[in-house]
């Protein structure tokens, strides 16, 4: 789709240029005392009135994403946008107008010199070329935007789905990790069950120890005619310690830390190959 001329009016063109916004984050906070909004971004800090901010917000909503954090704070994110900015001055009406044309030929207008200056300052870092010619051809496909200037051999390729792709990749990677961890946990649990003797064996050994110890205490008591309380108490303490140690070892072997990422590569590949082929990313994240 080709860019059309923004305007054919005989107004004076103060500046006309293109911007390629890869990523721009703007924070806006309302100052109750001064009754103005403070805009902050990597391109600078600005103050605008309430009505002026509302005008800017209407533009931001069309070219980016506006998030209302609370009653006084907004966050604006603009990414992967190519815009044609034309600052016009009407000698007849003595008014300033900023015409903004996006790659879909959607035309937006902003009036007021101070407000226009703020908008231009916000976008100046992403300027492609000053006074770029209208012969600039813009070819848009589903996957990319190619800007080709035949006179200046200007070539810019931008993935318009970059944000969505990154989001899907992160989701895909998280799902793969979760699934691998689950598989790893199940694998370790099965391996540990194979290495741990059955409960009946452990209880039998503990019971045998208790029986032998009790029989020894009983024989000594019958022989001497006195009850050995110290021996009985010591035996119970030893028995409790043995049970506690056995229980601790069993629990330690069974538990697998879900946040442990030391996962064999072979297991990762197996899980991805069998379960993750249809994930949105379409490839195994590195």
UniProtKB/Swiss-Prot annotation:
The chain crosses the membrane at residues 201-221, 231-251. Keywords: Cell membrane, Membrane, Plasmid, Transmembrane, Transmembrane helix. It is found in: Cell membrane. Its main location: membrane. It is a multi-pass membrane protein. The keyword Transmembrane helix applies. One of its GO terms (cellular component) is plasma membrane. This is Uncharacterized protein MJECS10. It comes from Methanocaldococcus jannaschii (strain ATCC 43067 / DSM 2661 / JAL-1 / JCM 10045 / NBRC 100440).
